[in-house]
Amino acid sequence: MKNTLIILLICLSPACIFSQVVITNTNFSLGTTGRIGVGLSPNGEGTQWKPLNLSGQGSLAGRMEQNDYMDLLPAIHFTPKLNGTDSTNVTFQVRLGMYSANGQFMGNTSTRTANGLTIILPETYIEARNIMGSRWSAWAGVRFRRYDDIHICDYFYFDDHSAQGFGVSYKTTELTLLMPASTDSSGVYPYNYAVTVAGATNPAIRQRQVWIGEHSIKFKDGSIIKLLGEFHYVPVTSKKALKYYPADNGWVAGIKYSNPLKTTLPGSFNQFSIRYGTGIANGGDNGNTFTWATYGPPDANGKYTHAYSFTTVEHFLLNLSRQVSINGYGVFTQSQGGSSSPNMDTYFNGTQMYNHKRDIVVGGRFLFYATDWLHLIEEVHYASRKDGDNPEAAMWKFTFAPTIAPLGKRDPWCRPHIRLVFSAARYNDYARDNHYSPYLQINQNRWGTYIGVKTEWWLF
């Protein structure tokens, strides 16, 4: 036995000597983002606070009255070296998200409360960048893989690929595979069904595959053109399945132009994007832009052959002086489901849903830096939504928010903020009479109101 161990050690020693990985520069970081506070609606039922934005648009038209939420982002960063050669930057990232549902304050609820505190894990992944000193990078896991956003609306408008999967990149070219299947098919193309094999019936999931290719072209003046292409596919169910779903697919093409602008203070920019998706890749509703969240009901064959979605976005920031910054945006989206109906049709689970919609939202934020630490924020937004052949629901929203910026920077990105928020929304007749916002679902007023104190932060 002793001789066997000696021989084994001799065999393993060369491998250990020539391939030992030394971990250096080990670091732990903890970041956090969030928004929390209190507020009420002076003219609302029970003065209970409810979001003022139009239904189906999420935070588009501003999010000063957004639900409480908080993210914790622990991460481990390390740089392994192999025999003194070039290093690789490796990060293990986790994001723990918590938010309150049903309009409740986060501190007044818990996970035991019905529709109360919700805890999610939207990020757990490993990413290796510049592998062995090369221009190659790779990642695997689940992550918020998203880029430019309209911050005042929390709207990641072009390339939000948040889901589970993996990806590789070389220089400015990225290839990604996502698999966003779920047993909860509410609001998205159904993946879950049951299959009977040898007399036993068990649940199964159709695995949607989302192949994504992206390439960025960088210019000497700092401007960037980004090209996007996607292909989505879901397979057919077998003869043993209790439900028949045909195979289906879709594709996406898009282009985004980002251009830095020369103003008195740095940081100004203009961004413009166009994206078109077809088939099951026509997602983009409820304030998100996930192309895999298929919109609308299918056709008579259970497919989305003629479905589409078109979205264009304009977004800019102007840092005009030490006193003034202006952040503006415009969003247009038109989507069609798989059905030929101009109004409503039947979804897979038997419910009726709209087959066509159009969103138009424009707005902006004006920041006046009264002092280094007192910033006066004003916002104006206009939003409209047309579902099917219904009349248009529309809203104007106005917000004034004196803000304490304790870090004392005259910068639109300076955080944390402590804000005193006053918001008022004026609805048209159709929106008011048809409950076209969470606020209007418990009130039927021409004007919706909100007064509150909120804090917003991101610390990394």
Task: List where the protein language model places each region.
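Residues that define the transmembrane beta-barrel architecture of outer-membrane proteins
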Residues: 26, 64-70, 117-122, 158-164, ...
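Beta-barrel outer-membrane channel/assembly domains of diderm bacteria
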Residues: 19-140, 171, 317, 325-326, ...
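Outer-membrane beta-barrel transmembrane domain signature
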Residues: 190-201, 357-361, 383-399, 403-413, ...
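Surface-exposed coil loops of outer-membrane beta-barrel proteins
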Residues: 39-62, 104-122, 132-246, 294-299, ...
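Alpha-helix termini
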Residues: 79-85, 129-133, 261-264, 405-413
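Bacterial Sec-dependent N-terminal signal peptides
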Residues: 1-21
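Transmembrane beta-strands of outer-membrane beta-barrel pores
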Residues: 36-42, 78, 96-102, 142-146, ...
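Detector for outer-membrane/organellar transmembrane beta-barrel domains
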Residues: 220-234, 244-387, 395-404, 457
